[in-house]
Amino acid sequence: MGVKKGIEEGVDFILAVGGGKHYRCGESIAHGTANPGVSLWDIWTKKESLTKTLKVGAVLTISAAGSETSDSAVLTNEAIGKKLGLGTELNRPVFAIMNPELTYTLPKYQIGCGIADIMMHTLERYFIPDQKNRMTDEIAEGLLRTVIDSGRMAMKRSDDYDA
């Protein structure tokens, strides 16, 4: 629906507002709109090359996995029950606004989900076998300590800018 509307309206920029899933959706719409007639699934399965996309901006309203800083994207083909990743610099936004004040009104449950998401994505990389890099591990450990401490603060007061 988003790609079709983007093509019909001649969209030349996508502004994704929300969390990582909103950003990923905007990214996919940008790829599809810039490549009319090409199946997104064919791009993800590498049957078609992705050589152009629309510019995408991100306004984050939740702290979580950091999708807006990654070159990775995912697409789910519900018809066949598959989910694939796609890594390309074309997945990066032209800007990302990450203002903690935009998260102040989140319910505690959602704040907790964001804390867990940050920790789990950090641990995924931390426990990759056969990739020994002490400095990267130390950064991950520091991030986990910070998220635990700041997470406790945010759970007590969601409008604490220092959290």
What kind of feature is each model-predicted range?
Residues K4-M98:
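Glycine/threonine-rich beta-strand-loop-alpha-helix active-site module
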Residues S72-A163:
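Carboxylate- and glycine-rich phosphate/diphosphate-binding segment that chelates Mg2+/Mn2+
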